[in-house]
Amino acid sequence: MQNRFLESITQLDKPLANALVPLLHDQFCGHIDASQFAGLVKASGKTEQQVLMDLLPIAAALANPPISEFYVGAIAKGSSGDLYMGANLELPGEALFHSVHAEQSAISHAWLSGETEIVDIIVNFSPCGHCRQFMNELVNGSKINIHLPNQETQTLAHYLPYAFGPSDLDVTVPLLCKREQEFNCDSDDPMIIEAIDQMGLSYAPYTNNNAAVVLETNDGATFCGRYAESAAFNPSMQPMQMALSNLIRNNRQYSEIKRAVLVESSVGKITLVGAAMDALHAIAPIELQHMVVEPLLG
């Protein structure tokens, strides 16, 4: 079991803890598939709702908040029945807008794993306005069930009434929908190819600046992040932050990063290079490789 879970596992009832420990192996990054979750529920003797709440300390153990020292864990449950944990991330010494919220982390975890709809969000503290707005960007976002400790389950529409969202800006294909934009790639570099593939899956309906980041560690492993925009603009999730959240969730260290690539569209109304460089340079002494590529028409 990973050391980061040693304290949180003690907060669980023994039957659930015993069933969960084998899942917390070195490769565990917060993903529990539907069959594994069913096994945990059976072993615990509790309801699904109770087990989801019990798992929140495990999700919070994925956090990296050097500024606030306030650990928030979240779990996104996909329509597949799989669970995707996420936690807050703060960059040391950097402006607070670089932070990743736990709900964003969990949602991005699900998105990168191929989920096309989130049906439940479980979180140990009430979602802030930023996160409520980000969730409203998702497929059927207003219908997502929000589960909080000691509170009645309510939909996002309850927490974000009279919401402003994608439809107000004539966007009919929200975040998590299956979509792919193809881009020109004349490189045989596997990392560049991966970045362009991820870029094609990014979500940028307001700026057309499809973008992605790929980080490579010393052992050759790669961790990606896609750009995910919000109709409210400010809650948009940057690809560098998503990649860093992905890295930390996988129990890797910033010191392991040896290469970082940002690719973005040539037809975008903005560029993310400045924001990506600021975030990267806060945690690793390496240069950002930046590429601008053209979309394939047709």
Curated annotation (Swiss-Prot):
Entry note: cofactor: Binds 1 zinc ion.
Record-listed Zn(2+) binding positions: H101, C128, C131
Highest taxon of the lineage: Bacteria
Cofactor entry: Zn(2+)
Catalytic site positions: E103 (proton donor)
One GO cellular component, as annotated: cytosol
PROSITE patterns: CYT_DCMP_DEAMINASES_1, CYT_DCMP_DEAMINASES_2
EC nos: 3.5.4.5
MF GO annotations: cytidine deaminase activity; identical protein binding; zinc ion binding
Principal EC category: hydrolase
UniProt-annotated binding residues for substrate: N88, L89, E90
UniProt keyword annotation of Zinc present: yes
A biological process term (GO) from this entry: cytidine deamination
Gene3D superfamilies registered for this protein in UniProt: Cytidine Deaminase, domain 2
UniProt-listed PANTHER family: CYTIDINE DEAMINASE
Subunit-structure text: Homodimer.
Protein name: Cytidine deaminase
Source organism (scientific name): Shewanella frigidimarina (strain NCIMB 400)
Phylogenetic placement of the source organism: Bacteria, Pseudomonadati, Pseudomonadota, Gammaproteobacteria, Alteromonadales
